[in-house]
């Protein structure tokens, strides 16, 4: 019996693993093609008046056709979140320097998946009053005319 060749298999396995991770990331963060990153941020995270998480996140899940594990809603208008982009730059979780922290505690709701398969996703709500961090980028065509617009909710502080 010939010895197994070690040259190609580890490389092939690594490539398959990387492809799998890339596909998983695309599915998790996929934004609709007809939306800018800022518009998708607004759809997912801006909710001036609190609503029940089960129905609110259901509207987001329709775009991705899967149950989102966790979603946070900021209870303030988009214009207020965009003003957060004018605070000093700080490092994001991914080490990029385009994050900004809200001026103070803000009302928000976190919805965490507890059970279900799409489209019957069920969420547990947690209401908080705490600062948040957003990643901001220059606006794209179709975005409001702010110097920077929020494109990613980086974390709740």
UniProtKB/Swiss-Prot annotation:
Residues annotated as the enzyme's active site: 45 (proton acceptor), 152 (proton donor)
Disulphide connectivity of cysteines: 53-96, 67-121, 85-136, 92-99
PROSITE patterns, per the entry: RNASE_PANCREATIC (PS00127)
Residues annotated for substrate binding in this entry: 68-72, 93
GO biological process: defense response to fungus; defense response to Gram-negative bacterium; defense response to Gram-positive bacterium; innate immune response
Signal peptide segment: 1-30
InterPro entries: RNaseA (IPR001427), RNaseA-like_dom_sf (IPR036816), RNaseA_AS (IPR023411), RNaseA_domain (IPR023412)
UniProt keyword Transport, yes or no: no
GO molecular function (one): endonuclease activity
Main EC class the enzyme belongs to: hydrolase
Keywords on record: Disulfide bond, Endonuclease, Hydrolase, Nuclease, Secreted, Signal
GO cellular component terms given for this protein: extracellular space
Subcellular location(s) of the protein: Secreted
EC numbers for this chain: 3.1.27.-
Role this protein plays: Has a low ribonuclease activity.
Recorded family membership: Belongs to the pancreatic ribonuclease family.
Protein name: Ribonuclease 8
Protein source organism: Pan troglodytes (Chimpanzee)
């Amino acid at each position: 019996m010939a010895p197994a060749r070690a040259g190609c298999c580890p490389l092939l396995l690594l490539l398959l693993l990387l492809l799998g991770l890339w596909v998983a990331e695309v599915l998790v963060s996929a934004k609709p093609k007809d939306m800018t990153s800022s518009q998708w941020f607004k759809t997912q995270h801006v909710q001036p008046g609190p609503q029940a998480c089960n129905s609110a996140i259901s509207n987001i899940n329709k775009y991705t056709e899967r149950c989102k594990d966790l979603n946070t809603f900021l209870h303030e208008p988009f214009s207020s979140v965009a003003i957060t982009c004018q605070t000093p730059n700080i490092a994001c979780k991914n080490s990029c320097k385009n994050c900004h922290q809200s001026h103070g505690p803000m009302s928000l709701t976190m919805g965490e998946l507890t059970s279900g398969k799409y489209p019957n996703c069920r969420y547990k709500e947690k209401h908080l009053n705490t600062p948040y961090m957003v990643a901001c980028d220059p606006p794209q065509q179709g975005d409001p005319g702010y110097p920077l617009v929020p494109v990613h909710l980086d974390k709740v502080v």
